[in-house]
C-alpha cells in the first residue's frame, strides 16, 4: 500500500483515537514488510534514567494497549516500580507515527493464560528458560536451560510462569503524526486527565 492509497479523508478531523489507530494499524499491516505491530516501549528506572526497546503489541481496545513480557526483566521491573510507560509506533512505509503514554496496569490472569496458550511451544519453553535481562554465562547455558525445561514439560500443557504476564498502557495522551512536504507535518494529540475521562483534541505545530 502506498501513501496515495491510504484511508480517504483528513485524519485530523477524527474525534476517536482508538478508531483512528485501528485504521492506521490495519493499513500498516498491508504495507509494512515485517512486524507492523512492533513498537518502541519507553520506561524509566528508579534514578529517572529512561530505557527504550522494541516490543510487539498484542492487543488493544478502548481500555488500552497490551503487550506481554517477563516481569523480572528490566522493563518489567521498571514498569512495576513506576507504573507508567510510553510507546511510539513508526510505520516508515506510510510515513506515519503514533505516540502514546499513560499509567500501566497488569492484565488479568485469564488474559495472560489465554495469550500464553497461543504462543509456539518453543516460546513457552523460552519463557521458563530465559532469565531475561540478567547476565548470561554463555549460549550453551541458555541452550542447557531450554533442554531442561523441554524435558520437564515433555508431556501435557506448559503452564505460564508466575513471572510472565502482560501489561496494559491506559493512555492519557495519544498523538498521531503524518509526514508532509517541507517538514510541515500534520499532527494531532488526544488528551485526557485520567484513563476513564473524555478526550480533548488539539492540533499541534509540527
From Swiss-Prot:
Protein residues bound to FMN: 53-58, 68-69, 75, 97, 132-133, 177, 187
Chain residues that bind substrate: 58, 115, 119, 123, 183-185
Reaction equations catalysed: pyridoxamine 5'-phosphate + O2 + H2O = pyridoxal 5'-phosphate + H2O2 + NH4(+); pyridoxine 5'-phosphate + O2 = pyridoxal 5'-phosphate + H2O2
MF GO annotations: FMN binding; pyridoxamine phosphate oxidase activity
Domain of life according to the entry: Bacteria
Cofactor field: FMN
Pathway field: Cofactor metabolism; pyridoxal 5'-phosphate salvage; pyridoxal 5'-phosphate from pyridoxamine 5'-phosphate: step 1/1; Cofactor metabolism; pyridoxal 5'-phosphate salvage; pyridoxal 5'-phosphate from pyridoxine 5'-phosphate: step 1/1
InterPro entries: Pyridox_Oxase (IPR000659), Pyridox_Oxase_N (IPR011576), Pyridoxamine_oxidase_dimer_C (IPR019576), Split_barrel_FMN-bd (IPR012349)
Entry's EC annotation: 1.4.3.5
Keyword Oxidoreductase: yes
Keyword field: Flavoprotein, FMN, Oxidoreductase, Pyridoxine biosynthesis
GO biological processes: pyridoxine biosynthetic process
Record text on cofactor binding: Binds 1 FMN per subunit.
Pfam families assigned: PNP_phzG_C (PF10590), PNPOx_N (PF01243)
Summary of subunit composition and partner proteins: Homodimer.
Function recorded in the entry: Catalyzes the oxidation of either pyridoxine 5'-phosphate (PNP) or pyridoxamine 5'-phosphate (PMP) into pyridoxal 5'-phosphate (PLP).
Family in the record: Belongs to the pyridoxamine 5'-phosphate oxidase family.
Protein name per its UniProtKB record: Pyridoxine/pyridoxamine 5'-phosphate oxidase
The organism of origin for this protein: Rhizobium leguminosarum bv. trifolii (strain WSM2304)
Recorded name of the encoding gene: pdxH
Amino acid at each position: 500500500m502506498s501513501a496515495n492509497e491510504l484511508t480517504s479523508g483528513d485524519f485530523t478531523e477524527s474525534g476517536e483515537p482508538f478508531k483512528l489507530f485501528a485504521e492506521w494499524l490495519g493499513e500498516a499491516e498491508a504495507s509494512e514488510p515485517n512486524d507492523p505491530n512492533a513498537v518502541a516501549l519507553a520506561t524509566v528506572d528508579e534514578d529517572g534514567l529512561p530505557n527504550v526497546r522494541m516490543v510487539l503489541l498484542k492487543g488493544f481496545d478502548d481500555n488500552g494497549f497490551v503487550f506481554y513480557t517477563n516481569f523480572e526483566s528490566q522493563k518489567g521491573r521498571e514498569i512495576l516500580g513506576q507504573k507508567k510507560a510510553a510507546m511510539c509506533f513508526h510505520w516508515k512505509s506510510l510515513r506515519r507515527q503514533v505516540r502514546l503514554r499513560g499509567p500501566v496496569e497488569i492484565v488479568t490472569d485469564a488474559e495472560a493464560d489465554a495469550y500464553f496458550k497461543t504462543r509456539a511451544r518453543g516460546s513457552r519453553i523460552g519463557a521458563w528458560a530465559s532469565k531475561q535481562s540478567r547476565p548470561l554465562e554463555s549460549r550453551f547455558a541458555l541452550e542447557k536451560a531450554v533442554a531442561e525445561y523441554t524435558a520437564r514439560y515433555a508431556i501435557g500443557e506448559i503452564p505460564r510462569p508466575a513471572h510472565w504476564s502482560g501489561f496494559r498502557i491506559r493512555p492519557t495522551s495519544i498523538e498521531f503524526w503524518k509526514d508532509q512536504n517541507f517538514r510541515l507535518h500534520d499532527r494531532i494529540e488526544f488528551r485526557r486527565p485520567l484513563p476513564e475521562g473524555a478526550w480533548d483534541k488539539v492540533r499541534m505545530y509540527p
